[in-house]
Design a protein with these regions (language model features):
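A eukaryotic "domain-start" boundary segment
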Residues: 1-4
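Generic hydrophobic, helix-prone segments enriched in Leu/Val/Ile
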Residues: 6, 48, 125-134, 239-243
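Context-gated lysine
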Residues: 25, 29, 33, 67, ...
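Generic detector of leucine side chains in alpha-helical contexts
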Residues: 23, 28-31, 36, 47-50, ...
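Glycine-rich catalytic cores of cysteine/serine-nucleophile enzymes that process amide/ester linkages
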Residues: 6-109, 270-273, 277-284, 290
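N-terminal capping segments
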Residues: 9-29, 105-160
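Activation targets extended, charge/polar-rich intrinsically disordered C-terminal tails
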Residues: 136-300
Length: 300
């Protein structure tokens, strides 16, 4: 038996992506709910649990890296503004004890859902290959798992991940992604004026600048000059989609409950999968965020 489960933890307060001001206000409200509850996640969280006869026991993969003190420093001292969305942090692969506490606490609050995929041997081998490469060093000092960032995509060679990117790349590696994942994704263009510090020629962005900007960049302009495009999978959008599908009579995703946590079960064992290695590729274009990552990782 081979299976992979994606657990999704919603944030204490829903994150509003309508515009920069809404994003800032909703994240601040979520932060205020989290201060005395370390198991809560400011913007939500996702993690992967893998079961396969090709590994010993059960493996859980949960990456984190956003330390509150570092976020405050970068926003209020360095004034990087919404550069925080692509900023690179030192990552931590969370222990099973932390994962268990996170799921137990947030489950009591009704903030945990899951999708469990029953998979075949070929899919399991590709997922195992993906995590082997993610955990192994690409030079004498670093492995991809050492770095956390919203713009990182771990199916690009030698890149770290954010928590949702890690989960989505797990599904892609196993050839498990369908159209529903588009409903989990945020698309927006960050105005270049709201990106500061090391990412934009030392530009200083105040919180007031963010709070006074109601809309994302729209219309024309030049990428990297007028705006930076952002595509990111949002745990709260994933959570809402799972909840909606759980409550519907979907023929593909079966509603189930395990250990008191509602979720979806999907049987993908009949998928035709070629090869036993994950589909890693080279990143096609490099932004200022990726340049910083390459420097930190010793890749340039």
């Amino acid at each position: 038996m081979h299976q992979v489960t994606i657990y999704v933890v919603a944030s204490p307060v829903p994150i509003n992506w309508e515009g920069p001001a809404d994003l800032y206000k909703s994240a601040l409200k979520s932060l205020s709910k989290r201060i005395l509850r370390s198991q809560a996640r400011i913007v939500g969280h996702t993690l992967v649990v893998l079961n396969s006869s090709h590994i010993e026991g059960t493996r859980a993969y949960s990456i984190s890296g956003i330390k509150l003190i570092e976020v405050i420093k970068r926003i209020f001292k360095e004034k990087i503004g919404l550069g925080i969305l692509g900023s690179v942090f030192k990552a931590e692969m969370e222990s099973e004890q932390i994962i268990d506490r996170t799921l137990r606490f947030n489950s009591r609050k009704g903030r945990v859902l899951f999708i469990k995929y029953l998979i075949n041997e070929a899919s399991a081998k590709r997922i195992i290959d993906f995590f082997d490469k993610f955990e192994n060093k690409f030079n004498h000092h670093h492995a991809p798992m050492d770095f956390y960032g919203g713009f990182l995509w771990p199916l690009y060679e030698n890149e770290g991940a954010g928590c949702t990117a890690l989960c989505l790349c797990t599904l892609i590696a196993g050839n498990l992604v369908n159209d529903e994942t588009e409903e989990w994704k945020v698309h927006c263009k960050i105005p270049i004026k709201l990106i500061g510090g090391r990412y934009n020629k030392g530009n200083k962005v105040s919180v007031r600048d963010i709070k006074s900007t109601k809309e994302w960049h729209n219309g024309g302009g030049i990428e990297g000059v007028d705006f930076i495009p952002l595509e990111i999978y949002d745990p709260n959008m994933m959570f809402n989609w799972i909840k909606k599908t759980f409550e519907s009579n979907d023929s593909y995703f079966k509603p189930v409950t395990e250990n008191g946590i509602p979720g979806l079960l999907v049987d993908c064992r009949d998928l035709d999968i070629e090869g036993e290695t994950a589909p890693f590729t080279k990143r096609p274009a490099i932004s200022s965020f990726i340049t910083e990552y390459y420097i930190q990782a010793g890749l340039m």
